[in-house]
Amino acid sequence: AWEYADKLLIVSVMVAGDSVIEQFTPYKDGVITSRKTFQKYYAQSEFRSFVETTLGDDAIAAGQGIFIVFKDKVEEQQFLLQRQHVKRDWNQKTQRELKTRAASTEALKKNIVDKHLDLFTDFWETALDLGRIPANNEFEFSDQIRRVAGSHNKAHQVLLSHFGDGLFKEAQKKRKEDLLVYFALGLFEKRKPKTQMPESLKRDIKAFYNSYNDALEEAKVALFAVGDPELIEKACNKAHDILQCGEMLEGHSYIFHKDYLGDIPPELRIYIGCATQLYGDLE
């Protein structure tokens, strides 16, 4: 299967703990079930080791008993990067910013935006999603926006005048947190430094860090920090204050819905991400 695979291979098995396996009759490296059939159960770590040893490559946990192995390492990075790219809804905040700044926006710039509102809104939301000005191939209507505004940079400046820079600065902060989590989890997985990477990641590094090495150094500090129980406890309290939901058990745990994962402090995202890499996604 690995020889035939072009970009990736997904491998899955049945996973069970000792409490389940003990219910059956041991037989060689598996068990005999109540239906008198042979079944081999794996522990998550055992299966990862088997896959990586057999294929001689890194395996990424996608769930309990499910691992993905990438032949295409650029695709692998793109997959891992997308895992940490939180899709945030900027629309409500954009509308709020628009109302507060409508009166102060320069008439000429306001006229341009109002005349092509859907186009500029799409561009603005793309910029907020990326936390930076999108490259030409990162915005679906690049040709149209460049015809109207001259360039992506000029369109962005018009929109900053229209909406203000507060929301964009917030988007930059959030996107850099996504990248910090991505790089920290890459270090946790002990993945080798990449000689090839997606073009979008190269742009991210250029926009948010001085260099790739700077990104790794910052991620290393963040990764080691999550080994401090006091820091995690403070992060849980902060997350509870931010989300205003979930179950906080003082000195023990904080339980919240995984849909809010992108809204919690980055150190807590890294902490959870380490567990996810070991045991699979939070499904």
Mark where each language-model region is:
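Conserved S-adenosyl-L-methionine
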Residues: 56-67
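Conserved beta strand-loop-helix elements of the APE1-like EEP
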Residues: 68-76
